[in-house]
C-alpha cells in the first residue's frame, strides 16, 4: 500500500473487508507511521490505518500551535475522509494521549 495524502495528511489504509474491524495505530513523538509497518501483517483479519501526525513524517507542518486537540482533529479528518465509523485505537507515547 502506498502513502495517500489528504489536506496535507499522510496515511496508509489497509482495507481488506467491510466486515472486519478497523484498528488505528498512532505513533509517538518524533516518529512516523513506519513504526507500525510490521504490525499490519499481524492483523490479517482487520482493516488497519496508520498515519503521520502533523509535523511528522510526510504530513504537513501544523499552521498553528501543536496541541493534542489539533492531533485529535487530524484523526477525525482522516477517518471521516475514508468513512470509518468505528475503530479500535492503539497509541504509543504521544499517540496514546490523543
Q: Can you say where each PLM-predicted feature lies in the sequence?
A:
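Residue-identity detector for glutamine
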Residues: 4, 33, 39, 74-77
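Alpha/beta-hydrolase fold catalytic core
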Residues: 1-23, 44-47, 80, 84-86
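Conserved HGGG/HGGXW glycine-rich cap/lid loop of the alpha/beta-hydrolase fold
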Residues: 15-60
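Active-site loop/oxyanion-hole signature of alpha/beta-hydrolase fold enzymes
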Residues: 49-90
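Gly/Ala-rich beta-loop-alpha elbow adjacent to hydrolase catalytic centers
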Residues: 91-95
Amino acid at each position: 500500500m502506498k502513502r495517500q495524502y489528504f489536506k496535507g495528511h499522510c496515511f496508509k489504509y489497509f482495507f481488506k473487508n467491510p466486515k472486519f474491524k478497523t484498528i488505528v495505530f498512532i505513533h509517538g513523538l518524533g516518529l512516523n507511521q513506519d513504526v507500525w509497518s510490521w504490525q499490519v501483517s499481524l492483523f490479517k483479519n482487520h482493516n488497519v490505518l496508520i498515519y503521520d501526525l502533523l509535523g511528522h513524517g510526510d504530513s504537513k507542518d501544523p499552521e498553528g500551535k501543536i496541541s493534542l486537540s489539533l492531533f485529535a482533529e487530524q484523526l477525525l479528518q482522516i477517518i471521516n475522509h475514508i468513512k470509518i465509523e468505528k475503530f479500535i485505537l492503539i497509541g504509543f507515547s504521544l499517540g496514546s494521549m490523543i
